[in-house]
Amino acid sequence: MLSTWFRKLTQRILHPSLSWVLPVKGVYFYETDAVENHGLLTPGAIVTLKPEPENEFDRHAVQIWLNDSPNSPPHSPSHSPCLLGYIPRSHSRRIAWLLQHAQLNTAEIESAYRQYHRLYIYVRLRFDVRWWQAVQYWIR
């Protein structure tokens, strides 16, 4: 019993993970309505994060792309990757740093819903980091 507890404790200390559920910002600027109409904004749908250092508003900007779906028709918006929006600026600096220095484990849609004609999308991100990367992350 003690060894199991100790193993779990050391696993968390030596190999911690950082996890968030974040809103996707700027969805009204992109093809999210068409993607939603095709039923692709489902929980668990895989997304890709791409840093955009040349962004004029935020040099740490991170784009969120919905991956292409192999089962989609050739001319649907799901056939090729679609830009959903961005990581919020409040988190973009740290997420951009983690994309360079840590292993992204999970990037998927947590939820998507409409409220008052506005689409809200949330993504779940999980990074596996070494203990020293976690320390560097928290002191940034």
Report residues per predicted region.
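Conserved active-site motif detector
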Residues: M1-R140
